[in-house]
Amino acid sequence: MDTAAVDRIIEKLIEVRSSNPGKLVQLSESEIKQLCVASRDIFLKQPNLLESEAPIKTRGDIHGQYSDLLRLFEYGGFPPEANYLFLGDYVDRGRQSLETICLLLAYKIKYPENFFLLRGNHECASINRIYGFYDECKRRFNVKLWKSFTDCFNCLPVAALIDEKILCMHGGLSPDLSSLDQIRNLPRPTAIPDTGLLCDLQRSDPGKDVKGWGMNDRGVSYTFGPDKVSEFLSKHDLDLVCRAHQVVEDGYEFFAESELVTIFSAPNYCGEFDNAGAMMSVDENLLCSFQILKPAEKKNKFVM
């Protein structure tokens, strides 16, 4: 995909930041398919366990809240001003999943070594068929386009290691994970199964009152206790697990004596939660700081 075409798409997508939130950007079907194909090729050329370097800014779930994504870029810097790692769940639930995923894929194509996208559990056909993305694709384009996204999502990497010390994924730990090479060796393209390592990396959750491994209220995967986080970090000589997947009131929340952090980047999620959104900045010394985007009814004030 030529650079000029990608630049035109990015320009179209970000010019609405001066408009009222919610204004649609109508790319052509051909442009979107090119984004899917070109980004898919890049995902497959890069490892399933990405190795990225600080400084980098990390973001959790976006869920089609496109105007919030643009505001997060305004505060953190539009690429290439900063390096970014997104932890998945770009689509479903929000009203502008297409704009959200298209801008992220376009940035991935333009800055493949500085802009990273991990897979969330909603980047899977069996989930986004139900929770809104399929319907949005069908309403604005057609089912065939949704299938192009499925082919792309099936190739997304599932975890990232920042300077060999911070392990990032969408969901959490797995009882099946004994070596990081297991992540590197997971097959792609693939759908997300209902059990096993890939499922857990996408869908497990920390549990404050859990010791070891517990049942998950979601009906899939596990919960894990602080003991499992400490054990995992010690075994693999890591400092922190960084994940998303759960709404947290302040946009970020520590667990297990600050050995794990949950980041959620969709403020006022679905218009139903009075939560803030957050972005974690990791500096060259691996010090983590958080930028908070308050919910809309609190005038979207951005604070450090």
UniProtKB/Swiss-Prot annotation:
<feature type="binding site">
    <location>
        <position position="89"/>
    </location>
    <ligand>
        <name>Mn(2+) 1</name>
    </ligand>
</feature>
<dbReference type="Pfam" id="PF00149">
    <property type="entry name" value="Metallophos"/>
</dbReference>
<keyword id="KW-0378">Hydrolase</keyword>
<keyword id="KW-0464">Manganese</keyword>
<feature type="binding site">
    <location>
        <position position="245"/>
    </location>
    <ligand>
        <name>Mn(2+) 2</name>
    </ligand>
</feature>
<feature type="binding site">
    <location>
        <position position="121"/>
    </location>
    <ligand>
        <name>Mn(2+) 2</name>
    </ligand>
</feature>
<dbReference type="GO" id="GO:0005737">
    <property type="term" value="C:cytoplasm"/>
</dbReference>
<feature type="binding site">
    <location>
        <position position="89"/>
    </location>
    <ligand>
        <name>Mn(2+) 2</name>
    </ligand>
</feature>
<feature type="binding site">
    <location>
        <position position="61"/>
    </location>
    <ligand>
        <name>Mn(2+) 1</name>
    </ligand>
</feature>
<dbReference type="InterPro" id="IPR050341">
    <property type="entry name" value="PP1_catalytic_subunit"/>
</dbReference>
<dbReference type="GO" id="GO:0046872">
    <property type="term" value="F:metal ion binding"/>
</dbReference>
<dbReference type="InterPro" id="IPR006186">
    <property type="entry name" value="Ser/Thr-sp_prot-phosphatase"/>
</dbReference>
<keyword id="KW-0479">Metal-binding</keyword>
<protein>
    <recommendedName>
        <fullName>Serine/threonine-protein phosphatase PP1 isozyme 3</fullName>
        <ecNumber>3.1.3.16</ecNumber>
    </recommendedName>
</protein>
<dbReference type="InterPro" id="IPR031675">
    <property type="entry name" value="STPPase_N"/>
</dbReference>
<dbReference type="InterPro" id="IPR004843">
    <property type="entry name" value="Calcineurin-like_PHP_ApaH"/>
</dbReference>
<feature type="binding site">
    <location>
        <position position="170"/>
    </location>
    <ligand>
        <name>Mn(2+) 2</name>
    </ligand>
</feature>
<feature type="binding site">
    <location>
        <position position="63"/>
    </location>
    <ligand>
        <name>Mn(2+) 1</name>
    </ligand>
</feature>
<dbReference type="InterPro" id="IPR029052">
    <property type="entry name" value="Metallo-depent_PP-like"/>
</dbReference>
<dbReference type="Pfam" id="PF16891">
    <property type="entry name" value="STPPase_N"/>
</dbReference>
<dbReference type="GO" id="GO:0005634">
    <property type="term" value="C:nucleus"/>
</dbReference>
<comment type="similarity">
    <text>Belongs to the PPP phosphatase family. PP-1 subfamily.</text>
</comment>
<feature type="active site" description="Proton donor">
    <location>
        <position position="122"/>
    </location>
</feature>
<keyword id="KW-0904">Protein phosphatase</keyword>
<dbReference type="GO" id="GO:0004722">
    <property type="term" value="F:protein serine/threonine phosphatase activity"/>
</dbReference>
